[in-house]
Amino acid sequence: MTNIRKQHPLAKMINHSFIDLPAPSNISSWWNFGSLLGLCLMIQIITGLFLAMHYTSDTSTAFSSVTHICRDVNYGWTIRYLHANGASMFFICLFMHIGRGLYYGSFTFLETWNIGVILLFTVMATAFMGYVLPWGQMSFWGATVITNLLSAIPYMGTGLVEWIWGGFSVDKATLTRFFAFHFILPFIIAALAMIHLLFLHETGSNNPSGISSDSDKIPFHPYYTIKDLLGAILLLLCLFSLVLFSPDLLGDPDNYTPANPLNTPPHIKPEWYFLFAYAILRSIPNKLGGVLALVFSILILTLIPFLHTAKQRSMMFRPLSQCLYWMLVADLLTLTWIGGQPVENPFITIGQTASIIYFLIILILMPLTNLLENKLLKW
């Protein structure tokens, strides 16, 4: 009797992607984050679906509907905090996944990398719109400040902002459309993730050494399914620890105050995972310049494959590049810290310095270090 796993059209597709997939034998735990992102997306879609059953996207009832979910719905508080902290876990995995791609040279798979950058933008847009939905103070003012940035676009900016708002300020129309987009985007993310995987399976996975692993492959199942399962258990352990012991650790206390257009919070700031980009935005005094720097801070990822001048793909055997890489990580952590601080000295100066260092490392120092390491190879 023929094996249904290898014969049935649908089972065959799953088999080729997750069971009999030839995988390099030496990939480390840094390769776990792809599957963890899939798990995070599933958690977000399921918890989001249950939240949408009780949420009302109306300015007069949105805040109280979230309160109702937490107080009156059976295990509503768990679902709400799983969704909120699940987003934080999503971004932790996302940053680790991108960091691994940069360190081990996975960006040379151009299609996979570029779809990944599109995915990052989509996830960021989804998270931003989700933050607006509880209709607390930080939700309202965050939405006002961030959407207002589009008014910096010459000629069409003001009209574009009013078009997004659906009026002359962030109001009922804005909340309703943000809810609609926030609901549909995760499914678009899931579709993009499938395309991401499709392109990855065209080339096969990279590995820590950065050299071809065609001569030494092992089946994905059981080796990497077990490994991914361990990662999933650890992720769920962290997520549930956060949800059950300290659910508001990563949130903003201002969001427990209903949105009030007449009262501006002293420090408007987004969620922690946007703070690095927010710090870059704030470090430029000019509005249009700030917006361009903000967009380019993410878009710069698409340039990395073209700035890669090294003979070796991975940083595993390139100590100078490793030093620069960890400087970049430290710089991003500094930017994240600065993004949460008030706009006053010395924070302004630190933010501007860290922003310059960020672009300097990626655009100039990395390619130069790569060329220097190429020279050192000949010694």
Swiss-Prot record:
Q: Which GO terms describe its biological process?
A: mitochondrial electron transport, ubiquinol to cytochrome c
Question: What Pfam families does the annotation carry?
Answer: Cytochrom_B_C, Cytochrome_B
Q: What cofactor is needed? A: heme b
Q: How does it assemble?
A: The cytochrome bc1 complex contains 11 subunits: 3 respiratory subunits (MT-CYB, CYC1 and UQCRFS1), 2 core proteins (UQCRC1 and UQCRC2) and 6 low-molecular weight proteins (UQCRH/QCR6, UQCRB/QCR7, UQCRQ/QCR8, UQCR10/QCR9, UQCR11/QCR10 and a cleavage product of UQCRFS1). This cytochrome bc1 complex then forms a dimer.
Q: What is its main location?
A: mitochondrion
The UniProt record gives the binding positions of heme b b566 as H97, H196
* Free-text remark on how the cofactor is bound: Binds 2 heme b groups non-covalently.
Q: Which GO terms describe its molecular function?
A: metal ion binding; ubiquinol-cytochrome-c reductase activity
Position of the signal peptide: none
Taxonomic path = Eukaryota, Metazoa, Chordata, Craniata, Vertebrata
Which Gene3D superfamilies would you find in this protein's record? Answer: Cytochrome Bc1 Complex, Chain C
Q: Per UniProt, which keywords does this protein have?
A: Electron transport, Heme, Iron, Membrane, Metal-binding, Mitochondrion, Mitochondrion inner membrane, Respiratory chain, Transmembrane, Transmembrane helix, Transport, Ubiquinone
Where a ubiquinone binds, per the record, is at H201
Q: Where in the cell is it found?
A: Mitochondrion inner membrane
Q: What family does the entry list?
A: Belongs to the cytochrome b family.
Explain the purpose of this protein. Component of the ubiquinol-cytochrome c reductase complex (complex III or cytochrome b-c1 complex) that is part of the mitochondrial respiratory chain. The b-c1 complex mediates electron transfer from ubiquinol to cytochrome c. Contributes to the generation of a proton gradient across the mitochondrial membrane that is then used for ATP synthesis.
Cross-referenced PROSITE patterns, in alphabetical order?
Answer: CYTB_CTER, CYTB_NTER
Protein's UniProt name: Cytochrome b
